[in-house]
Structures are given as structure tokens and as C-alpha cells.
């Protein structure tokens, strides 16, 4: 009788919060006000850049502890090294497949839409001074250099830098070592597990400053580049936005449907984070919040800790679409004939160079420069054509990358039987709060067959 009454007891309901008290509402207001200020008073808008930069720096300050604590406690609690390798392998298969689809989609759309045809630009007439710094940075993006850079100089150096993969590398090794230590490692695991609570309280505190950061960042973008630059290259920008939307709704929508959840409900669930990414033009700004929300949606902490940080370097769907679409736009605008062999070379180089792109604003432009440097058939001077609108495309790149990593985390969790489907439904429907958090122990998932 006691069990029956408990089973029939109504579930606790989330207290109603008016929309004007929720974070996403104030981020929207901040973006609108920032855009208006940047348009009406461009000089003032440009001077507000430190607000956006300061918020990004505050978030990046907490990213390393979040990743380290999540991965170490997740792996050490699993206590099976083979599980870690299996999750990582499944994630890399997913990343490779959908990154390839994104690159192919960019190529196909460029051939169908022809965004650069008819511009008849002579590369010799383009001013290359503004892109020189991007080209110089792109020379450092080599495969060997990228792999070697994953290994930090010391055990502590990843925590004073901004290389997510170095933090991931150290965290995985430390988590495995802690798991192998057995009972003697329990005190350390308990300490790290306890530390996650104040760290994520700090994340919640920083997220309350998101409207200020979004306001400053969007005011700077509109003030510096203006909306006029969008008119001149509107066909390219529009093609990129529509292609990214197609990728999210059709391709990611299909894999979401097959995995048992709705892409539209997922987007609604992550609306605050997506608005933050839109305002700051950086998917990295919402990384800590994404990790916590994926656990709240029913993913095991150990899977989230491995998939999300790795995806920020290896699963950049928006950047991949941008690279092939922008490269063919430059070729079309400069009347450069690309044979199928040239396009295959471009595709293969883009597959490699995109894996080192960071989750910060402007990284996609540097990656494009690295790709065109290796494929000389496309004049790198043509990058000057899109420099003025790259910031506007950067926002779409970041949004697509962010959604892609959220979907990847849910899909890999499902493959691993590490997804609580009841908790996912509650989170995506928004009917009740998801009580589990990153500082909670992993619960047994409820997996639908």
C-alpha cells in the first residue's frame, strides 16, 4: 500500500517563473539594444567591445576546471578504461561522418546556388593587408603541430592556457589513473566530486552576466562592420545561413528523430545558451552550461565529459559548411576554374584543417586561410572579399557547431545505453525540472529498446 501511494503521488512541479525573469529574455533584450546602439552610434558601439571580451574571458576562466572535474569524476566512477576508449571511439566515428556530410553540403550548395558567379573580381586588385595576419596564423595549423600541441609541457600548464584538448588529455589520464588506484583513490575522488558543486555555482553566477556580454559584443559587431556590408555580399551570407539551417533541421533533425528526440525541442531547451552564442559569436561561451544541461537531460556525466570538449575541436559542422562554401565562392568570384581533382583536394585538406579550429570567434576564418594556403588554385587574396561579413557568418558557424555538439552528445549517450529517456523527455518538454546536475552521481539510465 505504501509503495502504491508513492507511485501514484504527483510529481513535483517546477515553480512558475515569469518570462521576464528568465535569462533568455534578457539576452534577447541585450542583443536588440546592442544592435540598435551599434547601428545608431557606431563609435560608441565599438567602444563597448571590452564588455563582450570580459565576459568571454570570465567564461574561459572556468572552462578548464569544469572539463577537468567532469571528466575525472566521470571516468573514475566508471572504473573501466575500456568504457572510456569505447565512448571516445564512437564519438570520433560520429564526428568524422557528420563533418564529412557538412563539407559535402557546402560544396553541393555552392554548385547549386553559385553565390560568387558574375562578380568578376581580379585578385590582383584586392587589398591583402587586412588578411595578412590571418594567413600568418594559418601557417601554424599543421596536422603534426596540432597533434603535438595536445600534449602539454607540464601537468599544470593546461590550466593556465586556453587549449581545451590539453585539459581533456590531462583529465582523461588522471581519471584513468584514479580509477586504477581503486579504494586508495576514493578520498581524492570524493574531494574532486565535492569541488564540482562550488565550481558550477560559479558557472551559474557568471551566466547571470550573459546579457551584459551579449550587449557589448553585438554593439561592437554592428558598430564596426555595419549592416551595409551584409547588403553587398548578402547572397553569400544568405546561402550560408540557409545551408546551415538545412543541415540542422534536415540532417541533424533526422538523426535526432531516429535517436528518439526532437531537434526543435532540443533547440528550445537550449534557447538561453543559443542566444548567448548568438550574442557573443562564440560557442565556447556556452560550453560549461551545455555540459550541465546535457547531464540534466539524462546523459551520463562520464559521456558528457568526453564528448562535449572533444566535439569542440572535432565536430564543427558550421565551420565545415562555411569552409567549402566560402572557398568555392572565392573561386567563382575570381573566375577561377576548379577541376574535380582540385575540389577533391580542397575537400580533403578542409577535413584535416577544420579539426584544429577552436570554439572562439574568428577561428573559422583562420582555418579557411590554412585550407586555401595548401590549395593554391583558389587565390587566397580572395579572402579579402568576405572579411567584412565574416563576423556575421561567424555567429551562424558558432550556432551550428553548438547544436551539432548537443545532438552528438545525446546520440553517443544513446549508443552507450547511457541516456535516461524519461529524464530527457521531461527536460525537452519543459514540464518539470531536471534535478540531476554535473555535481551529482551518475544514475542508472532508463534505456528504451
Swiss-Prot record:
Keyword Cytoplasm tagged: no
GO biological process: L-aspartate transmembrane transport
Transmembrane regions listed in the UniProt entry: 20-42, 62-84, 91-113, 164-181, 202-224, 239-261, 344-366, 370-389
InterPro entries xrefs: C4_dicarb_transport, Na-dicarboxylate_symporter, Na-dicarboxylate_symporter_CS, Na:dicarbo_symporter_sf
Localization, UniProt: Cell inner membrane
UniProt main location, coarse: membrane
Keywords: Cell inner membrane, Cell membrane, Membrane, Symport, Transmembrane, Transmembrane helix, Transport
Pfam family, one: SDF
Disulfide bonds: none
Molecular function (Gene Ontology), one example: succinate transmembrane transporter activity
GO cellular component annotations of the record: plasma membrane
Membrane topology according to the record: Multi-pass membrane protein
NCBIfam families: PRK01663.1
Recorded family membership: Belongs to the dicarboxylate/amino acid:cation symporter (DAACS) (TC 2.A.23) family.
Function in brief: Responsible for the transport of dicarboxylates such as succinate, fumarate, and malate from the periplasm across the inner membrane.
Protein name: C4-dicarboxylate transport protein
Organism for this UniProt entry: Xylella fastidiosa (strain 9a5c)
Amino acid at each position: 500500500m505504501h509503495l502504491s501511494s508513492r507511485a501514484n503521488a504527483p510529481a513535483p512541479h517546477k515553480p512558475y517563473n515569469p518570462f521576464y525573469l528568465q535569462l533568455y529574455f534578457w539576452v534577447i533584450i541585450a542583443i536588440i539594444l546592442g544592435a540598435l546602439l551599434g547601428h545608431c552610434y557606431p563609435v560608441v558601439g565599438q567602444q563597448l567591445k571590452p564588455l563582450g571580451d570580459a565576459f568571454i574571458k570570465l567564461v574561459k576562466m572556468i572552462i578548464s576546471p569544469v572539463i577537468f572535474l567532469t571528466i575525472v569524476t566521470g571516468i573514475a566512477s566508471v572504473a573501466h578504461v575500456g568504457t572510456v576508449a569505447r565512448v571516445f571511439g564512437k564519438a570520433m566515428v560520429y564526428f568524422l561522418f557528420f563533418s564529412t556530410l557538412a563539407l559535402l553540403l557546402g560544396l553541393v550548395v555552392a554548385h547549386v546556388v553559385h553565390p560568387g558567379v558574375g562578380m568578376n573580381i581580379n585578385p590582383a586588385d584586392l587589398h591583402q593587408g587586412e588578411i595578412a595576419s590571418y594567413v600568418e596564423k594559418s601557417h601554424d595549423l599543421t596536422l603534426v603541430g596540432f597533434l603535438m600541441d595536445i600534449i602539454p609541457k607540464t601537468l599544470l600548464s593546461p590550466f593556465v592556457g586556453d587549449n581545451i584538448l590539453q585539459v581533456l588529455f590531462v583529465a582523461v589520464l588522471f581519471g584513468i589513473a584514479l580509477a586504477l588506484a581503486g579504494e586508495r583513490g576514493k578520498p581524492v575522488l570524493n574531494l574532486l566530486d565535492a569541488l564540482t558543486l562550488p565550481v558550477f555555482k560559479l558557472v551559474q553566477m557568471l551566466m547571470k552576466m550573459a546579457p551584459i556580454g551579449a550587449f557589448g559584443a553585438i554593439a561592437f559587431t554592428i558598430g564596426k562592420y555595419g549592416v551595409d556590408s551584409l547588403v553587398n555580399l548578402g547572397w553569400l551570407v544568405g546561402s550560408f545561413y540557409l545551408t546551415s539551417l538545412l543541415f540542422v533541421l534536415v540532417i541533424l533533425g533526422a538523426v535526432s528523430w531516429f535517436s528518439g528526440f526532437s531537434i526543435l525541442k532540443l533547440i528550445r531547451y537550449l534557447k538561453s545558451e543559443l542566444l548567448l552564442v548568438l550574442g557573443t559569436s562564440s560557442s565556447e561561451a556556452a560550453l560549461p552550461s551545455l555540459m550541465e544541461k546535457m547531464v540534466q537531460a539524462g546523459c551520463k556525466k562520464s559521456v558528457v565529459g568526453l564528448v562535449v570538449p572533444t566535439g569542440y575541436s572535432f565536430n564543427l559542422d558550421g565551420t565545415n559548411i562555411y569552409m567549402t562554401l566560402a572557398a568555392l565562392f572565392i573561386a567563382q568570384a575570381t573566375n577561377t576554374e576548379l577541376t574535380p581533382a582540385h575540389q577533391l583536394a580542397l575537400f580533403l585538406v578542409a577535413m584535416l584543417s577544420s579539426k584544429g579550429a577552436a570554439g572562439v570567434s574568428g577561428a573559422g576564418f583562420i582555418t579557411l586561410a590554412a585550407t586555401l594556403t595548401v590549395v593554391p588554385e583558389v587565390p587566397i587574396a580572395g579572402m579579402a572579399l568576405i572579411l567584412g561579413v565574416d563576423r556575421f557568418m561567424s555567429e551562424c558557424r558558432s550556432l551550428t557547431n553548438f547544436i551539432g555538439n548537443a545532438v552528438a552528445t545525446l546520440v553517443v549517450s544513446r549508443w552507450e545505453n547511457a541516456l535516461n529517456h524519461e529524464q530527457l523527455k521531461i527536460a525537452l518538454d519543459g514540464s518539470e525540472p531536471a534535478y540531476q546536475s554535473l555535481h551529482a552521481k551518475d544514475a542508472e539510465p532508463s534505456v528504451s529498446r
